């Protein structure tokens, strides 16, 4: 149950979220979670609406419930009505001839709209102009990647190196050879996947794949006695491969290593994957870890598309850019890594920032040790005024390094609220540099709220079969709105058809809260929606969180291993 207060209204809304109750108290937690997952993944609009109506009939014997506090005191009372609130969303293609029935119109408390799917920018085949597409794969196949010119000018291509056990090398070599082949998706994936034309055709550059037994194919052992032994041997082989020149190193992880996912390093328990990433990032080496369970023919076209993108990006190339962002705006995401106490030392918090502009430049990641952090009851860290001021200065420097000028506007995203010290410190720092326009935004999931779209047309009213559209937004107050980054999108095979990626349950929106700034809701929503298409570690049509937040939090998990390099600036592609 959730209670939501509405600005300038004498009433609030009550949200009911169905949950499963297990009578068997001895049922294992993992089993309960799996049963719940399967149940809610199939609880779509109409079934959800029916479930709510069943509970309404149980809770409300009449039109409303009346309560007195204390009981019997009529002077202080409140009541709960069984009328659900509605939101009116007007898209650019809405039909003005459709009249909303009065019984629905009276229940409209919120209004909003729908942001179109953001377009991505690709150089045309003849490179005479830029073309635009909302589907990353189709855009690449029909055009060229942003950094095509590097290969046309220097003819350098993309080189791979491999670390794999000799016993598994034949199978792994067969799998990565698919990178050079034409592949077609299975029928059920036709709504968002296109044919894979081979690496050279997709990215307009040559891919050099080594063979087992060559100097660019190092053999690891199949069996180790500890995670530490794996890490030591892998890093040794990484150093050998790095001597042979720049390449993307593929590291095969066999199932025999499953039990060694963490290692003890200087008293800390560290994820093996993160340890390898941090080791390589500190040396400017890009890697791609591939687990043995990936080497199946199931969804092969999808896997090879994903792997090809990872390789292209980790060769420090840019595949696409956003078409809708202001080139004079700097975008930063804040993530944190908190170290538990080690050898009686205090917690250490590392802050990180992520800078973007529409051209794909300035993709920098810098570590900043946060001195004297302030923790809330949930152990979330916050910056003091002094640390926030330093953070603002760091943004200026990162942008200057990439663009040779200062931005006129700065937008900062993070998952937790901004304290007054953080607001004042960041704004004062940027203002001192002449930057007056500063947007401070908190982005978090709003799981309490479910929106069930109504089908309103000339034939009547009913619950829609499909979830809410991606890009829908609802204004809650002057500084708060909801944005659906996950939802229905057009099908790539026929854009008049609807496609719901994953097809699971009812999508939850993001709750956006503004602590500084004056941009319109449409501007902020368009920027956030665009950044959900900028995670270059995936060919998913989008991620639920914008890349400013999604990548910053992921990178923060690796960054604490590099805390001794807190003044160094990294290309973020070293971490993905």
Specify the residue positions occupied by each region the protein language model found.
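Long, contiguous domain-sized segments
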Residues: 1-30, 195, 199-212, 218-227, ...
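Extended, highly charged clamp/arch subdomains and adjacent linkers
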Residues: 1-288, 373-381, 569-576
